[in-house]
């Protein structure tokens, strides 16, 4: 785990002989605590080369936890903000890695499994601004959830002006 982390953080390549040795002893990773695996994997995900997290799967170091060793497209991890929730969410989505297999904090698990909750907090429009449109109580929360679902698919729309326009259009009906 650490060899891959050092490669991700420090920008070097792991020699073929070292990779072969890691592959041969990969089953020993089953003896590592979930906390240790989570810590090392998260450091890789937050590094300048987060795509190397896929090496842990390809080398068999996470075979006992799940996830696909065939995980192309991990360069997309670099496009995510270098923060735990977005990087974990993308890693799990791209590899099928089960976040529930590791002892992770409740907030991280919730952010990965329920991205809409984080999207509500990230809205560029406040509940007060929705209240100014005439919404009250639970209707504000419902509108925030609908707008959050929208920005998950269309992040470019997360501006106050665009969200206000969407909320107004929804209020005026079809």
For the regions a protein language model found, what residue spans apply to each?
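Glycine- and charge-enriched loop/helix tracts that form the active or gating conduit
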Residues: 1-84, 122, 138-144, 148-151, ...
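C-terminal accessory/binding modules appended to enzymatic or scaffolding proteins
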Residues: 112-146
